[in-house]
Amino acid sequence: MNMMTVKQGVWAALLWPYLLAASIPLDCKDEQGSFSACPSISQEKLLDRVIQHAELIYRVSEESCSMFEEMFVPFPLRLQRNQAGYACITKALPIPSSKSEIQQISDTWLLHSVLLLVQSWIDPLVYLQTTLDRYDNASEMLLNKTKWVSDKLISLEQGVVVLIRKMLDEGMLTATYNEQGLFQYDVLPDMLESVMRDYTLLSCFKKDAHKMEIFLKLLKCRQTDKYNCP
């Protein structure tokens, strides 16, 4: 590892708490704890906040995955992540994957796809925090990053729900995906199996977090320059 890489790692460690503290909050709660303040934000500004949240979530998930990989996953095992038994938990979700599929769906369904992804990851990230506590050498920064992503994912869910409500012009919206069956680990695995499962979770979440960011930015593009979007 060269000196430049070391310096970049040190600066990332020092600046990370300030980066998170400076991020624009998505939470629209008023003093009573309700979300009545969210509708008062324009759809354009709310979408901007949601995009910024998604960008940060993806960035931190990428850092978390790299940290976990370097600390716990030997290189030969990194190649096993895509083998049978380590499929992503969101593989069965009705999420558009190809460019042609994405181009054909409406703005509302594009946003709903983001919501499906967000909601399907809330429980797995809570589970991940629990399992990471079992690791003897898990760094405090890795634990903090995972906790931060888990908390911010809930805020992102709230923002996306309000956005869908605004786009549908509805006063109330309940959009909850039943993730039962998507994520169920009833038996405590051995340590190697636990490492591979956690590595798969982090890798798959990083991939889906990037997909959330792309979908939201595409939605923004459609609303500002519809005919020149990818």
UniProtKB/Swiss-Prot annotation:
GO terms for cellular component: extracellular space. Disulfide bonds join C28-C38, C88-C204, C221-C229. Residues 1-23 form the signal peptide. GO terms for molecular function: growth hormone activity; growth hormone receptor binding. It is found in: Secreted. One of its GO terms (biological process) is positive regulation of growth. Its main location: secreted. Glycans are attached at N137, N144. Keywords: Disulfide bond, Glycoprotein, Hormone, Secreted, Signal. It comes from Hippoglossus hippoglossus. This is Somatolactin. The keyword Protein transport does not apply. Belongs to the somatotropin/prolactin family.
